[in-house]
UniProtKB/Swiss-Prot annotation:
It comes from Streptomyces rochei. This is Xylose isomerase. Belongs to the xylose isomerase family. Homotetramer. SUPFAM superfamilies: Xylose isomerase-like.
Length: 394
């Protein structure tokens, strides 16, 4: 069985991922920068579908209009030559010192600049064919509880997103926004730290249909949460507009590991995306190990795609993967589909004596989760996929 990725698999990478130079708070870069054109070419050779970018990844901050046009022209030529796509773009509103905050800054001029910088890159994203625009609020928050009124900050954030939604609508762009939640870093207390926070915020916007979420594996795990549950809720809400795949080793700083971390959880993530019919790109937001040279960078990118394809297979190809799938399963749960409704409305429920008066509490308490034969009506809807897991062996 081949695990060679093809564009049909829709694997994408950010310029900032394979282009990460290995710089961290305690050490300088271990690799030189990567030319975006080379990135496009190498990822295409590996079988990727597309590439994503922050504005400053493609056009260094402060570039003149002439320099910007030159960078874009070279990038577009590389896309045309390789057939690579740009499904998503985003804005760097966190690196330059002006962005101590951004959409929620106490300084009105900083807020206005952040929105205008975003609008400029939205134009480029739409020009390159992007369908999703990700917004990560890494600088939205505080280290001191008295530094900012959170209610005012949320009002400011709402104003910014409403303006962006108005702009996209006025321009007629076929573009939706995906808010990327993250806790703990770089601000001590970040606004919209989890999928749930983002979903609640979206409902207060003027055009909620334009906004969804871009959950990242490591970000939910940084908060000690269950990532498959988070993306399941996003799918349930119809708001999974994009997804960032990577690995994380527990509650700590944002590691952005490749898929080598937590393969058991990866099984559930991949199965959920595939069984739910998610049609968006499978985007890897990871950092190649700081210890690697460029050969290791491309090997790690290739490994991300290969591991996804391995986990996607209904029957694992190797004993280690089988063990991972068994450990990831909940052996006593035999179904992943919803059961039949409680009743045909409230009146029918109140009239149903088996729901309360005649309900055998002790018998139900003694019943295990695995039931044979299956209760009448508790079957999968037509065409609904289910998780198939090998039985546990001791």
């Amino acid at each position: 069985m081949s695990f060679q990725p093809t564009p049909e698999d829709k694997f994408t990478f950010g310029l900032w991922t394979v282009g990460w130079q290995g710089r961290d708070p305690f050490g300088d870069a271990t690799r030189p920068g990567l030319d975006p054109v080379e990135t496009v070419q190498r990822l295409a050779e590996l079988g990727a579908y597309g590439v994503t970018f922050h504005d400053d990844d493609l056009n260094p901050f402060g570039s003149s209009d002439t320099e910007r046009e030159s960078h874009i022209k070279r990038f577009r030529q590389a896309l045309d030559a390789t057939g690579m796509t740009v499904p998503m773009a985003t804005t760097n509103l966190f690196t330059h010192p002006v962005f101590k905050d951004r959409f929620t800054a106490n300084d009105r001029d900083v807020r206005a600049y952040a929105v205008r910088k975003t609008i400029r890159n939205i134009d480029l994203a739409a020009e390159l064919g992007a369908k999703t625009y990700v917004a990560w609020g890494g600088r939205e928050g505080a280290e001191s509880g008295g530094a900012k009124d959170v209610r005012d900050a949320l009002d400011r954030m709402k104003e910014a997103f409403d303006l962006l939604g108005e702009y996209v609508t006025a321009q007629g762009y076929d573009l939706r926004f995906a808010i990327e939640p993250k806790p703990n870093e770089p601000r001590g207390d970040i606004l919209l730290p989890t999928v749930g926070h983002a979903l609640a915020f979206i409902e207060r916007l003027e055009r909620p249909e334009l906004y969804g979420v871009n959950p990242e594996v490591g970000h939910e795990q940084m908060a000690g949460l269950n990532f498959p549950h988070g993306i399941a809720q996003a799918l349930w809400a119809g708001k999974l507009f994009h997804i960032d795949l990577n690995g994380q080793s527990g509650i700590k700083y944002d590691q952005d590991c490749g898929s080598r971390r937590r393969p058991a959880g990866g099984v559930l993530v991949v199965d959920l995306l595939e069984s739910a019919g998610y049609e968006g790109p499978r985007h890897f937001d990871f950092k190649p190990p700081r210890t690697e040279d460029f050969d290791g960078v491309w090997a790690s990118a290739e490994g991300c795609m290969r591991n996804y394809l391995i986990l996607k297979q209904p029957r694992p190809p190797s004993a280690p993967t089988r063990r991972c799938r068994r450990r990831a399963s909940a052996p006593r749960v035999w179904t992943s589909w919803p059961s039949r409704p409680l009743a045909d409305g409230l009146e029918a429920l109140l009239a149903d004596r088996t729901a309360f008066e005649d309900f055998d509490v002790e018998a139900a308490a003694a019943r295990g989760m695995v039931r044979t034969p299956r209760p009448a009506g508790d079957g999968p809807p037509a065409g609904r996929a289910r998780l198939t897991v090998a039985p546990r062996k001791r």
